[in-house]
Amino acid sequence: MTSTPQRIASIAQSLDGDVQLATALCSATSLAEVGTIARAAVRQRLRCAGVTFVLRDGDQCFYADEDSIAPLWAGQRFPITECVSGWAMLHGKLAVIDDIEQDERVPTAAYRSTYVKSMVVVPIGGPDGPAAAIGAYWPATYQASRADLDWLPRLAQATSGAIADIGLADAPWAPNFRTRFPASAH
């Protein structure tokens, strides 16, 4: 992986000048580290109550990790067609849900035992399509700012580049994820 000053500056510019975040993503050496960096950035920027890092594994979504005020779904798998992270990956679009009770994409039964009332999920992936997602969650109905909704896809792109650079040898539980990220273009 090449962490040239020019590359870091380019990524930092796309992340509203956040050189520290760009440097951390460019320096990451494992998928777990990339997930930790991305989750921390989202939680800090969006001031949300929880963040998940989700990987696509064939027709399943694997909730690889989370940083949350209460447990959500870390370590669990769900059919890709039955969760919002899966919807974001399948459609390659940001899922913005101000009120989970009012959005048909939300499998409300999965949320009844959680604090989640609002969420935003951004897909992460290369040209072959998204193979990961980051979800941000709030305990009340919430509308994310336009600036934050514009920033999330840029973070997803930088995260995708970091994943492409490190490879996925440390992700044996997600064999289909491994082939989804070609070498980084940045």
Identify the residue ranges that each predicted region occupies.
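Signal-transmission linkers at sensory-effector interfaces
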Residues: 1-32, 44, 162-186
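Signal-transducing coupling segments at domain and membrane junctions
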Residues: 62, 70-73, 98-118, 138, ...
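A short, aliphatic-rich beta-strand micro-motif
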Residues: 117-126
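Amphipathic alpha-helical "output/dimerization" segments
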Residues: 144-164, 176-178
